[in-house]
Amino acid sequence: MSCSATDLAVLLGPNATAAANYICGQLGDVNNKFIDTAFAIDNTYLLFSAYLVFSMQLGFAMLCAGSVRAKNTMNIMLTNVLDAAAGGLFYYLFGYAFAFGSPSNGFIGKHYFGLKDIPTASADYSNFLYQWAFAIAAAGITSGSIAERTQFVAYLIYSSFLTGFVYPVVSHWFWSVDGWASPFRTDGDLLFSTGAIDFAGSGVVHMVGGIAGLWGALIEGPRLGRFDNGGRAIALRGHSASLVVLGTFLLWFGWYGFNPGSFNKILVTYETGTYNGQWSAVGRTAVTTTLAGCTAALTTLFGKRLLSGHWNVTDVCNGLLGGFAAITGGCSVVEPWAAIICGFVAALVLLGCNKLAEKLKYDDPLEAAQLHGGCGAWGLIFTALFAQEKYLNQIYGNKPGRPHGLFMGGGGKLLGAQLIQIIVITGWVSATMGTLFFILKKMKLLRISSEDEMAGMDMTRHGGFAYMYFDDDESHKAIQLRRVEPRSPSPSGANTTPTPV
């Protein structure tokens, strides 16, 4: 909204100048209020999205708790709390600066340590909160891969290092205005004329967390009893499918802040006089997210039925999350029909990675490396195949002839950028987190003792079980709860009566 006192003066006649100045002043005030209101709405939208993403920590905690054995429940839930707490402090001190401290070089940020000089025109407290929620999500992914056998001090060290340095550097590369591969670069020097497209973090979040977990689990080795002497896999099932389902639905809910919230703003008009604005893109992103997850869940359901003969709810939950991890990178730049393809292939990737992990005797209690690493990598490739040019221009700035999806007629440049992203993330996380886990192992700070692992860390490290196996009130013996395990069969095999222990 604009106003010219000179133009108004001609129309108003005598004493026109004062009247024109007054009218323009009032219109200017109204215009400023509109700007302030738009900023407040966008800021509220980002804060609400941050709250949704943070709620995913509860989902991670429940998912992890249900996926491990009961004797390690307190341990895994404590590590999830630790991820958020340690991540909050180290992301405040270092992480946000390394990620978004502009102006900086293409490798790492160098401003805003401890949020110094914030707020600015490009960085605000709400943006820090939102990005912190992403950082601790990456750390939460890693904790699942090394569950049930890792020392508590190792969790503290790796979580702080990941959220304070490793993850922020990757997010700087692909999400900041200075990153060498970022599509947001202000100097126009884009990788393959497009930059690597990873809208909400299939690579930046999921691959980082998954590959870090991969190295942790590889260096630690499998849990005791996971494979027999002949190398055959033995299922060490989690103790609560109910918690797995609860955690999955909480993560699903939080993903609506994870993906649509990554727009950061909602009051952006694309075409004047139409309904086509960022508010519509936000809705489309929520739809693509939903369709990818639902398709992956159903594909996993029937795929596992064919492979194992069972309808397994925990496998379906993992398939659902694999679809979400895959669509995260391209959720805003593809059509809803393409999201169905994304989810279908993500389920196949997850099933294939799980088969490969079993053959290689790789043990990941939550399938985190397969789910987040494998499906995240597929999500980046999927974006290179199906990204729409008009959506890329709306989000990343209008650039005529911008490279887009290969299958959409956009050539292979975007695919090249996405493959480079996969390679550099794999290399960076392997070099940093792999080295860290190796050092921790050499210092005997990584894996717990065999005795602790057999007994369970809840009892040996955390002072007791997460659940009451019996009622401490001796006057109510009749309502004691007991674990029931089968007796070893007699030579004749006749005695199959369960024995309380």
Swiss-Prot record:
Q: Which InterPro entries does this UniProt record tie to the protein? A: Ammonium/urea_transptr, Ammonium_transpt, Ammonium_transpt_CS, NH4_transpt_AmtB-like_dom
**One term under GO cellular component:** ammonium transmembrane transporter complex
Q: Where in the cell is it found?
A: Cell membrane
BP GO annotations:
ammonium transmembrane transport; lateral root branching; lateral root formation; protein polymerization
Q: Which GO terms describe its molecular function?
A: ammonium channel activity
Checking NCBIfam families in the record gives: amt
Q: Which PANTHER family match?
A: AMMONIUM TRANSPORTER, AMMONIUM TRANSPORTER 1 MEMBER 1
Task: Report the family membership.
Answer: Belongs to the ammonia transporter channel (TC 1.A.11.2) family.
Q: What is this protein called?
A: Ammonium transporter 1 member 1
Q: What is the lineage of its organism?
A: Eukaryota, Viridiplantae, Streptophyta, Embryophyta, Tracheophyta
